[in-house]
Amino acid sequence: MGSIIISALLALVIGAVVGFFVRKSIAEAKIGGAKAAAEQLIEEAKREADALKKEALLEAKDEIHKLRTEAERDIRDRRSELQKQENRLMQKEENLDRKDEALNKREALLEAKEEALNERQQHIEQMESKVEALVKQQQAELERISGLTRDDARQLILERVEKELSHEIAMMIKEAETRAKEEADKRAKAILSLAIQRCAADHVAETTVSVVNLPNDEMKGRIIGREGRNIRTLETLTGIDLIIDDTPEAVILSGFDPIRRETARIALDKLVQDGRIHPARIEEMVEKARREVDEHIREVGEQTTFEVGVHGLHPDLIKILGRLKFRTSYGQNVLKHSVEVAFLAGLMAAELGEDEMLARRAGLLHDIGKAIDHEVEGSHVEIGVELATKYKEHPVVINSIASHHGDTEPTSVIAVLVAAADALSAARPGARSETLENYIRRLEKLEEIAESYEGVEKSYAIQAGREVRIMVKPDMIDDLEAHRLARDIRKRIEEELDYPGHIKVTVIRETRAVEYAK
């Protein structure tokens, strides 16, 4: 048993020793392989390093060669440029030398000429001295022979020449003036006749009545209303007389103000068509008619400017122009008259080479003040100038308005043409009627007197001027003041107006109290 254990131990020891040497040999073998591999790697790294070193050297040599080549080329270019600059400088130097030589030659030539001129000047001065002495000698001899001094002889000759020339100039001026007047008369007659022939005016005298047709005679009673309240309301609101007589199916509206008459006609037409006729409805329709008339006035103004070819007028001026449709002067419609004057002035301006459109503009606006002369103080010329200035019209237009009646001196040819065209249009046979104009002026004066008093809201001359109705403000005029106002207006009418028969003065003071039930 003990021998077995010993044998086992010996075997174990021997095995351990053998294993140790085997492992050592294996380790040494591995170490040797690793050394060989490391040496091989080192060798390969050395070869790669040598290759990279050679490659870097080659690249460095190539770069050095390129830089050297570029440097040599740059040096050659610079040398070439320097050579060119040197050549140019040498050429400039040669040119300067040649110019200097030429200047020296010219300087020598000029000096020679200057010397020759000095010699010639001295010779001329000597000759002038001799000539002056001879002239003085001859003048003294002439003065001795004629008995006149030099100044006396000059004055005598000048007087004689002046006398002859003055006579000839006067004759020439007289002949020129005669020819100019004859030519101007012929030219003016030709231009006026041509303008009149080319401007055809179709216009008849305005009337002071309008007729409203009725569907039947029963409508007359409804228009009059209970105890005449409807007709009174309509007449009070419009200031127009309603004449209801035996004329079948018609009502006549009479009034000198065409705008009021047109307003009344439209309102009455609407009332007849609607069938409801009572004071409240009448007020509503009259107000609606006023708006329609205002719109119609604007459209008339725009249509007129389009017809005449005048553009760029201020909208307010266009509306004022449209009001001229409802304004007459001696029975002649002022808007038609203004259009006629515009065309006549334009035609004459074109013949004379002036601005045709500016002449038309001045002719169209020459009576613009008549549209509101019954509302604003001053003559229609003053009002027209004020309107044209306010709306920045051309200075020629303003002067044409101011001078067309001779109140101001015309400053342009167009202003003279507008005045001539105005006279032509007014003087045309049948264009105006003096009697109608006087009648309308009397009615306007009636209203002007009534409205000049404080507290008067509106006044209407009706019944062909036989009555004036005055609407007063109830908060300013009481019943006693109304009677006093009527007396004062009556006295002024008697003092300032000439009229046939009697004029009834009616002062109306109306107070309304309105409440709404909810």
From Swiss-Prot:
Subcellular localization: Cell membrane
Class in the EC hierarchy, top level: hydrolase
Ranges that cross the membrane: 2-22
Residue ranges constituting the HD domain according to the UniProt record: 334-427
EC number: 3.1.-.-
Assigned GO CC terms: plasma membrane
InterPro entries attached to this UniProt entry: HD/PDEase_dom (IPR003607), HD_domain (IPR006674), HDIG_dom (IPR006675), KH_dom (IPR004087), KH_dom_type_1 (IPR004088), KH_dom_type_1_sf (IPR036612), Ribonuclease_Y (IPR017705), RNase_Y_N (IPR022711)
Major subcellular location class: membrane
Domain KH: residue ranges: 208-271
Keywords recorded for this protein, A-Z: Cell membrane, Endonuclease, Hydrolase, Membrane, Nuclease, RNA-binding, Transmembrane, Transmembrane helix
Molecular function terms, GO-annotated: RNA binding; RNA endonuclease activity
GO biological process per UniProt: mRNA catabolic process
Topology within the bilayer: Single-pass membrane protein
HAMAP family named among the record's database cross-references: RNase_Y
Primary role: Endoribonuclease that initiates mRNA decay.
Family: Belongs to the RNase Y family.
Listed NCBIfam families: HDIG, RNase_Y
Protein name in the entry: Ribonuclease Y
Organism of this sequence: Geobacillus kaustophilus (strain HTA426)
